Design a protein with these regions (language model features):
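Amphipathic terminal alpha-helices
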Residues: 167-172, 177-196
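Glycine/proline-rich active-site loop of Rossmann-fold NAD(P)-dependent oxidoreductases
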Residues: 20, 33-35, 47-57, 91-103, ...
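Active-site Tyr-X1-5-Lys
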Residues: 10-38
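Short aromatic/basic micro-patch
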Residues: 2, 39, 76-79, 164-165, ...
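A conserved pocket-lining segment of Rossmann-fold NAD(P)-dependent short-chain dehydrogenase/reductase
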Residues: 8, 60-80, 84, 88-92
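Glycine-rich "substrate-gating" loop/helix at the edge of Rossmann-like oxidoreductase active sites
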Residues: 12, 43-52, 72-82, 161
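Conserved C-terminal active-site "lid" loop/helix of NAD(P)H-dependent oxidoreductases
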Residues: 82, 113-116, 139-177
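Mid/C-terminal beta-alpha module of Rossmann-like enzyme folds, strongest
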Residues: 91, 95-151, 183-190
Length: 196
C-alpha cells in the first residue's frame, strides 16, 4: 500500500522506536511551549560517500554473482538520496507552510531498477536470477542460527515489500521535487565504491 504522513506508525527496530518516541516528545514540547516544529520522515537515506550497509551488501552480492531477486517482479525500493533530503530540510526551514507539519521524503523504484543501477555503476550486467518467496523464507528460517548466512527473514521482507512512501504532501505544500532517481543514485553509489 501507500504510506502517507497520516498513517499509523509501526516502529519495528530500535532506531524506528527511538525516532518515534523523540517525535512524540518534540510534538508535545512544541504544543506546551507554543514552538513551531517540522518533522521530516525520510525513507532509507543514502549517498555516494555514505556507507549504507544494506546497499553495500547488495552490491557485494551482485559483484560476486550470488545476488538473486526474491518472489515476483516489482518489489518496492524506497530510498532517498542525501541531496534530496538536504533540499527538503532547506524547504522546511524556510517555508511558512512547514510549521507544525510532518513530511515524508522518499523516492521509489522497483527492486529491479535499483539493482540495475548498482550493477551498471559496477560495470556489470544486471542479474536476473530469481528464487521463489516460499523457498527464500524457508532458507532464511532454516539457516537463521548460522550467523554467516546472508539471507535473513528481515532481508527477505525488505526484498519483497510492495509499499510505497508518498511525497505528495511535501511536493504540493512546499514545492519539493526529487532530483536523484534511485537508479541514478545507485549507479553513483556503485561507481564511488569502485573508485574508492
Amino acid at each position: 500500500g501507500v504510506v502517507r504522513e497520516n498513517c499509523a506508525l509501526n516502529p519495528s527496530n530500535p532506531y524506528e522506536i527511538s525516532k518515534t518516541d523523540f517525535d512524540e516528545i518534540l510534538q508535545t514540547t512544541a504544543r506546551n511551549f507554543k514552538v513551531e516544529v517540522c518533522l521530516v520522515r525520510p525513507s532509507n537515506v543514502y549517498g555516494p560517500d555514505m556507507r549504507n550497509q544494506s546497499i553495500q551488501q547488495m552490491l557485494n552480492a551482485i559483484q560476486k554473482n550470488v545476488f538473486a531477486f526474491i518472489g515476483p517482479e516489482g518489489a518496492s525500493a524506497n530510498y532517498v538520496h542525501v541531496h534530496d533530503v538536504v533540499q527538503a530540510l532547506d524547504l522546511c526551514l524556510d517555508h511558512p507552510k512547514a510549521a507544525n507539519q510532518t513530511f515524508i521524503i522518499s523516492a521509489w523504484a522497483t527492486m529491479e531498477e535499483m539493482v540495475s543501477g548498482l550493477a551498471g555503476g559496477a560495470g556489470l550486467n544486471p542479474p536476473s536470477r530469481r528464487i521463489p518467496l516460499t523457498l527464500a523464507t524457508w532458507l532464511a528460517m532454516t539457516m537463521q542460527f548460522w550467523s554467516r548466512w546472508p539471507l535473513t527473514l528481515s532481508r527477505v521482507q525488505a526484498m519483497t515489500l510492495r509499499s510505497r512512501y508518498s511525497t505528495e504532501k511535501i511536493e504540493k505544500e512546499l514545492g519539493w521535487k526529487l532530483t536523484v532517481p534511485i537508479m541514478d543514485g545507485m549507479r553513483e553509489f556503485a561507481q564511488n565504491c569502485r573508485h574508492s
